[in-house]
Amino acid sequence: MIQGKLKRLKRYFTRALHRIQKGPGYTYKELLVWFCDNTNTHGPKRIIKEGPKKRVMWFILTLVFAGLVFWQWGLLILTYLSYGVSVSLSIGFKTMEFPAVTVCNTNPYKYSRVKPLLKDLDELVATALDRIQYSSQTQANTFTYNNTRQNVTLDPALWNHIPLVVIDENDPSNPVIHNIFDNSVFYSKNNLLRNSSEDQTSYAQRYKVAMKLCTNNNTQCVYRNFTSGVQALREWYLLQLSIIFSNVPLSDRVDMGFKAEDLILTCLFGGQPCSYRNFTHIYDADYGNCYIFNWGQEGDDTMSSANPGADFGLKLVLDIEQDEYLPFLQTTAAARLILHQQRSFPFVKDLGIYAKPGTETSIAVLVDQLQQMEAPYSSCTVNGSDIPVQNLYEEFNSSYSIQSCLRSCYQEEMVKTCKCAHYQYPLPNGSEYCTNNKHPDWVPCYYGLRDSVAIRENCISLCQQPCNDTHYKMVISMADWPSAGAEDWIFHVLSYEKDSSYDITVNRNGIIRLNIYFQEFNYRSISESEATNVVWLLSNLGGQFGFWMGGSVLCIIEFGEIIIDCMWITILKLLAWIRNRRQRRQRPQYADPPPTVSELVEAHTNPGFQHDDGNHVTEDIPGTPPPNYDSLRVNTIEPVSSDEEN
């Protein structure tokens, strides 16, 4: 039974192979005529059925409309491969997670705690101010200086490494450079700054304050110029401050900053009391101790708000203690705050806003939820795992953001180029923060990287936006707080609650009130969806084919069939041509068999083998006739088994 089925299957494939070897059995012309006569597409049938003139007309129309179909198909395929998206927008109100709120004091350290550390640095800055400041006491706006600081003792360890200089550009081709801390230059009788014959404008145009940045043991130096002495001093002060505090342990720096109970005086959320204990501490390189409300870290439950308005949001009273500000560090007295997602790192310096002391600041929040399509529709990243940059902010258990990626990328370049890490960013594994003792050339290297356009563009190209992101749009309004009639009792109560003092220790210069709440419409969802898909592509391809030529999928199959048949015939013809060519190459030059040796010998001795030039006709020798049979049947008999007939 099984052997019989195998035999039948073998015979079936044998016959199929024979049919393939023989081909369709038609010529090209016969195939085209058959296709035009049997296809369901409109147009080709008219080419073979109509008269000569109409044949030409229908042939041209068929070619034109076929070209239009292929052109439209090309446009549709290109549109599909462009992976376009459609954007939908929805606005409304619903119960939502309240954003995480990070608050900082713009002054990172209490001056009373760090004054011993900064004594020498502050004296240096005061001396520099005396030597570059201007006075408008006279009509000529002459420069005045403080003689009491003429004999001040300057610590060379602080200023020799990165000195402040004044560049005299009276002769642009040959500028003169003076060290601000050099007493012999600035207090000589003929020093340039004591010249009172020039006014303030000419002085500002002539003299520029700069930082001198040197590498390779002071053999290669550049000057970082500033348009204002204030900018130069503050930049230089920040740099020196970072060098000083790089040797201070983090725990000590935290103790030198503002405690949560000192900064956050009162707290209400949704009408329910809260306190500084509901805030999570985080240390910021620029602002010191910062505190985050509703961060959602370490399994903490996040808080939600179900109603709009200030009564259902967060209310805070902050005290920034302006009398504890470092005099040469911060020129702005305010609180710095930022609204961000839960479990995301707050980049307060770059994305935060200020809250002014002596005011009540109300912030109405609208949540923008952005949802982008993944690759290939966009270059966004889902969680940052496909970004070739190590996220240094993972130690805070925070989610991916483009800000964290850019800073991690810059820190990697810093470690690679300068051989040390910058103190403002997290420390990569196997590296150390920059110090003057171990890395004497790190400051010029840092400024070179910071000013490098190529480094910024490289990091921007590596870092991608997250596919799902949330932004908080804020409408901010302010009013004086407290009012003149209420400030006395409010300050008494706040002072007592802060340090149990009956004396007023809180004043308008440091007090801030914040109201953060949802607007009437608290969310706006902007989401992307694919503008084209396979269903869209197939329907449009079929629509164009049906509109221009009245065809369908079966017509495409018919067209594919004739193409396969034509290719089949072409292959068979090519194989036959190759086979015939091989046979011609293998065919002998002479049709008769070659003569034997004896025949060749006899040809030289027997003249009968010589060529006869005359027209001699040899008589035919009569042959033997064939035998007589009653019948002669010559037929090709092909044995056919009974199974095959069945």
UniProtKB/Swiss-Prot annotation:
- Pfam families to which the protein is assigned, alphabetical: ASC
Q: Does the keyword Nucleotidyltransferase apply?
A: no
What spans are recorded as compositionally biased (Basic and acidic residues)?
610-619
Disulfide pattern: C104-C290, C214-C221, C267-C274, C380-C467, C405-C463, C409-C459, C418-C445, C420-C434
Where it sits in the cell: the answer is: Apical cell membrane; Cytoplasmic vesicle membrane
PROSITE patterns the record matches: ASC
Disordered: where is this region? 586-646
Regulation of protein activity = Originally identified and characterized by its inhibition by the diuretic drug amiloride.
Record topology, Cytoplasmic segments? 1-57, 573-646
| GO BP annotations, alphabetical order | sodium ion transmembrane transport
Residues on the Extracellular side? 79-551
Q: Name one GO cellular component term.
A: cytoplasmic vesicle membrane
Transmembrane residue ranges: 58-78, 552-572
Q: What reaction is this protein's catalytic activity?
A: Na(+)(in) = Na(+)(out)
Report keywords, A-Z: Cell membrane, Cytoplasmic vesicle, Disulfide bond, Ion channel, Ion transport, Membrane, Sodium, Sodium channel, Sodium transport, Transmembrane, Transmembrane helix, Transport
Q: How does it sit in the membrane?
A: Multi-pass membrane protein
Q: Which NCBIfam families match?
A: ENaC
Q: What does this protein do?
A: This is one of the three pore-forming subunits of the heterotrimeric epithelial sodium channel (ENaC), a critical regulator of sodium balance and fluid homeostasis. ENaC operates in epithelial tissues, where it mediates the electrodiffusion of sodium ions from extracellular fluid through the apical membrane of cells, with water following osmotically.
**Subunit and partners:** Component of the heterotrimeric epithelial sodium channel (ENaC) composed of an alpha/SCNN1A, a beta/SCNN1B and a gamma/SCNN1G subunit.
Name of the protein: Epithelial sodium channel subunit beta-2
Supply the source organism for this entry.
Xenopus laevis (African clawed frog)
